[in-house]
C-alpha cells in the first residue's frame, strides 16, 4: 500500500467515525499474479459513500506535466486496459468511482490531491484523449489537507 493510499483510507475512516456513519474504508490485500480492481474501497449503505477509488501519484518536481494513460495505467495479459477493467467493475458493483491523483511537489512543498470522477476519465479514454494534463487535473475538486492528513468532505467534491 502506498503512503497516499494509506492516508486516504485513514482519512475516510476518520471522517466516517467523526460523522457516526455506518461505513468502512479499506484496501484489499493485493495477491501476486492477481489483479486488484481498485486501490481504496468504501462500503456504505449511503450511495454517496459507496465508492471505488484508484490512486495515482505523479512527481511534478521531477517534471511530470501529465498523467498518461499508457504510462501510469496497466494493460493485463489479455490486453485489457486498466481503465476498461475498472469501468466494468464499477458498472457491475454499482460503486461511484474516482481517480485520486496526488501531485508530489518535492521537499518543502506540500502535496496536492484531486478527485477525478471516473466517468470523466472513461470519457477521455474512449475518445482516445489519452492523458490528463496538470491543468486538467487541477480543474477537478481538490482533496484538501488537514496537517499531514487529507480532509474528507464529499460535499466539496462537486466539479469546480
Regions found by a protein language model. Give the residues of each.
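Mg2+/Mn2+-dependent nuclease catalytic core
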Residues: 58-85
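Conserved catalytic cores of phosphodiester-cleaving nucleases, focusing on short active-site segments
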Residues: 40-42, 49-62
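Short acidic/glycine-rich loop or secondary-structure boundary segments that cap or lie
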Residues: 35, 61-64, 107-109
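Nucleic-acid nuclease catalytic cores
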Residues: 84-121
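Short connector loops at helix/strand junctions that flank enzyme active sites
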Residues: 35-37, 46-52, 81, 92-94
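Helix-rich interaction surfaces within compact, conserved domain-sized segments
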Residues: 5-21, 114-160
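Histidine- and/or cysteine-centered catalytic micro-motif in compact active-site loops
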Residues: 30, 45, 55-58, 102-104
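Acidic-basic catalytic patches of nuclease active cores, encompassing PD-(D/E)XK
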Residues: 1-36, 43-46
Amino acid at each position: 500500500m502506498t503512503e497516499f493510499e494509506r492516508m486516504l483510507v485513514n482519512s475516510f475512516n476518520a471522517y466516517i467515525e467523526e460523522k457516526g456513519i455506518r461505513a468502512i474504508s479499506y484496501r484489499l490485500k493485493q495477491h501476486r499474479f492477481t489483479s486488484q480492481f481498485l486501490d481504496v474501497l468504501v462500503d456504505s449503505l449511503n450511495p454517496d459513500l459507496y465508492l471505488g477509488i484508484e490512486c495515482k501519484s505523479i512527481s511534478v518536481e521531477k517534471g511530470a506535466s501529465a498523467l498518461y494513460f499508457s504510462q501510469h495505467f496497466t494493460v493485463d495479459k489479455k490486453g485489457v486496459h486498466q481503465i476498461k477493467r475498472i469501468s466494468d467493475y464499477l458498472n457491475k458493483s454499482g460503486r461511484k468511482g474516482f481517480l485520486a491523483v496526488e501531485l508530489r511537489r518535492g521537499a518543502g512543498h506540500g502535496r496536492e490531491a484531486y478527485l477525478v470522477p471516473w466517468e470523466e476519465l472513461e470519457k477521455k479514454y474512449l475518445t482516445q484523449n489519452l492523458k490528463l494534463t496538470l491543468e486538467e487535473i487541477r480543474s477537478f475538486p481538490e482533496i484538501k489537507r488537514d496537517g499531514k492528513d487529507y480532509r474528507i468532505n464529499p460535499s466539496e467534491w462537486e466539479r469546480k
